[in-house]
Amino acid sequence: MARIIGIDLGTSNTAAAAMEGGRATIIPSAEGSSIGGKAFPSYVAFTKDGQRLVGEPARRQAIANPEGTVTAFKRRMGEDYKFTLRGQEFTPQQLSAFVLQKVKKDAEAFLGEPVEKAVITVPAYFNDNQRQATKDAGRIAGLEVVRLVNEPTAAALAYGIDKAGKEQKIMVFDLGGGTLDVTIMEMGKEGTFDVLSTSGDTKLGGTDMDNAIIEWMVSEFKKSTGIDLSADKQAAQRLKDAAEKAKIELSTTMETDINLPFISAGADGPKHLELKLSRAKLESLVDSIVKRCGASIDQALNDSSLKSTEIDKIILVGGPTRMPIVQKYVEDHAGKKIERGIDPMECVATGAAVQAGILTGDVKDVLLLDVTPLSLGLETLGGVTTRLIERNTTIPVRKTQVFSTASDNQPAVTINVLQGERPMAKDNVPLGKFDLDGIPPAPRGVPQIEVTFDIDANGILNVSAKDLGTNKQQHITITSKTKLSDDEVQKFVKEAEKFADEDKKTKERVDAKNEADSVLFQTEKALKEHGDKVPQEDRLNIDRALGDLKEALKGDDVERIKKAKDDALAASQKLGEIIYKESQAKAQGAAGPQPGAQAQGQPNDGGKEDVVEAEVVDK
């Protein structure tokens, strides 16, 4: 099988690896080691004469060419956003492709053979749009992306590949330049890597720490000179480089000097920035950023149903985890010492190469079971999100459920696909929508629309809808852009907790109305067919109860609606007896759901999903 390389396409740095002699080997950058070690900086630049630079050469000239240089474009993946470099516009996918093209070229020089396929890592909390954008970047670079792997999962593969035969529960704490992922995994004796849960924040990383240092530097310089450097583009790149360098140095020393000569000029001549930054001061600057990591640790543990005492090993991934304050915070918060001896800058690329080896057969007896980070569902009657796939479900996965129409003679249904944890559709991310039309005229609840959600091993979603009566089918691969920013996706789980009471009340109200409306519809339908057989007194009671139910449905009093529904059911008991006796007399006893029957989406004995009545929104 053709060679497949593993790539860690990072916000700040990018690294690649390949299986050589049964072991994963880091592919060196053509320019040699840089600030990221064997990884190279994720920078792209265009010079005045139109030359394109990628990696260390782009970073080195960034100070002199701020308008032609860009980095951290990974934070915009999956968004409708364009960067302007010397008058030219580039999407995040294009810029990422330039980085991947360099990886491809370096790999071919190192391996001495063409490279056309790759496994690329992504943050575990990347949504569907961001994953699609990453695959597109690979295609632009001339690489077939055979698999996307979550970054913490790749790190665990790198850690555990030579520890087969040991059962361990592992927490991977992955704090990179732009994102945080916390993943809980179970490593089995038979070489299985089973992801139990994942949580994270797509807008939290080392870049935020750099910005905190820059703000301090700008503030100190303004105090001493009265000059504000925050709007100076050329100074901005020098400040960024100095902040990153100081942050790295203070991981091993207690104090560092920051010297930026000729950073600006005043009426009395040139100005130089000369500051001392201690580790204690740095830690005070980034303390609030580091503490934001705690919520993701807690969420991952909670979703895995494990206590911190049940975790055997903690693996740290990403450059910022070299900082003593980060290491101490993770140890204190999780209540366990971290695992030493793992290179946080190279282990993700190494794990990607291991996954590539699994696909080619070079690595034997290893099974990776990853999960989807956010729940997936569709909008149903009343603006409710009906989930088909819960978050932290092992992928690949395929789930099917049967729905029906919301009104009589409804010719089409709209499938509005959603991602998130909130019970109401408006609070979740709309991933895409499509129509299934051509439904033959029929009473509501009679048509059976089979909806299937299918997530592949890359975490990319395909949705299909099929009219079981006509076999007409429509499907969509989710590729649409989210209208929300990355940090808003992460907010969903937190919002679900914060607004739990409000969400619960809204969901109860909608459910109560849907159930009551179903009782009203079924009873009125039965009266049309069998009302002449009901004694007059019983008929009056039924009509009165249905009238009360209609009035209750005009308001939002849940208890009143429930009571009116129960009263209507009790009043129509005689009607039910008449229908049952008539059915017995005809000896029909037909199997399967009756038209419009309300179901709860649980599989029946035959493995099919029951019909959920009147749940798909009208077109």
Swiss-Prot record:
Q: Which domain of life is it from?
A: Bacteria
Keywords from the named record: ATP-binding, Chaperone, Nucleotide-binding, Phosphoprotein, Stress response
Please list the residues that carry the modification Phosphothreonine. T179
Q: Where are stretches of biased composition, namely Basic and acidic residues?
A: 606-619
Where are the residues of the annotated region Disordered?
A: 584-619
Q: What induces it?
A: By stress conditions e.g. heat shock.
Q: Which SUPFAM superfamilies match?
A: Actin-like ATPase domain, Heat shock protein 70kD (HSP70), C-terminal subdomain, Heat shock protein 70kD (HSP70), peptide-binding domain
Q: Which InterPro entries match?
A: ATPase_NBD, Chaperone_DnaK, Heat_shock_70_CS, HSP70_C_sf, HSP70_peptide-bd_sf, Hsp_70_fam
Entry GO MF terms: ATP binding; ATP-dependent protein folding chaperone; unfolded protein binding
The function of this protein is: Acts as a chaperone.
* PANTHER family linked to this entry: HEAT SHOCK PROTEIN 70KDA
Descriptive protein name: Chaperone protein DnaK
